[in-house]
């Protein structure tokens, strides 16, 4: 992954490693220097539908792709992939052209958390990816760019929050499952 490659392609693989644990760290480090639009982030080799969802949430750190042999996939997996692609399209411009704010460092924390926002600060895609211990520990994920005077609707969870609440932090409780993820899509009302 180097700048010289950007002369020939605007998007490249950050790594051949698509396993979620290492991939979260790879994407975190890459995002400190490169925009998300340069990263090709793929879902591959899911063992279960829950694993497919977790890998999808990890791959939302950049340009989404799939590395699967679809003729061998079950109808449930194919249906879930169609849903995931539709969901990705809702956030694609925010991920590829928005501003990125890391909240948790996967090298020192039990996972990764970050958000993307648009220049107007009217939309926020917040992602939490747990990779290890501290099951049931509650974290506060603060969206410092939210306008404290505005109200935001979470289009995924269906709840409404004030900008002041987003700035103070959204509580998220970890899980005993080391591959636990959670997303929020806040839209200014």
Segments (PLM) and residue ranges:
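Aromatic- and carboxylate-lined catalytic core of secreted/periplasmic carbohydrate-active enzymes
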Residues: 62-63, 67-104
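Conserved, mostly hydrophobic/aromatic
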Residues: 59, 126, 154
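Glycan-recognition surfaces
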Residues: 1-72
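Residue-level detector of short, conserved catalytic/binding motifs and their immediate flanks
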Residues: 57, 124, 182
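Active-site proximal loops enriched in glycine and acidic residues that flank catalytic Cys/His/Asp
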Residues: 70-72, 127-130, 156, 188
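C-terminal beta-strand-rich structural cap/linker in extracellular carbohydrate-active enzymes
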Residues: 163-189
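Solvent-exposed beta-hairpin/edge-strand motifs
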Residues: 144-158
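Carbohydrate-binding surface patches
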Residues: 106-147
């Amino acid at each position: 992954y180097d700048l010289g490659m950007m002369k020939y392609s605007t998007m490249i693989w950050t790594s051949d490693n698509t396993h979620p644990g290492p991939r979260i760290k790879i994407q975190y480090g890459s995002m400190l220097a490169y925009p998300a639009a340069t990263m090709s982030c793929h879902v591959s080799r899911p063992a279960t539908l829950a694993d497919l969802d977790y890998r999808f949430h990890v791959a939302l750190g950049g340009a989404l792709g799939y590395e699967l042999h679809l003729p061998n996939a079950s109808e449930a997996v194919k249906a879930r992939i169609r849903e995931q692609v539709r969901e990705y399209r809702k956030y694609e411009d925010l991920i590829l052209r928005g501003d990125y704010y890391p909240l948790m460092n996967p090298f020192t924390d039990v996972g990764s958390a970050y958000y993307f926002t648009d220049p107007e600060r009217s939309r926020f895609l917040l992602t939490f990816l747990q990779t290890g211990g501290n099951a049931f520990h509650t974290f506060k994920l603060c969206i410092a760019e939210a306008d404290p005077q505005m109200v935001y609707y979470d289009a995924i969870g269906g709840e409404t929050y004030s900008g002041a609440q987003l700035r103070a932090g959204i509580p998220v409780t970890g899980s005993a499952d080391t591959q636990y993820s959670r997303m929020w899509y806040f839209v200014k009302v």
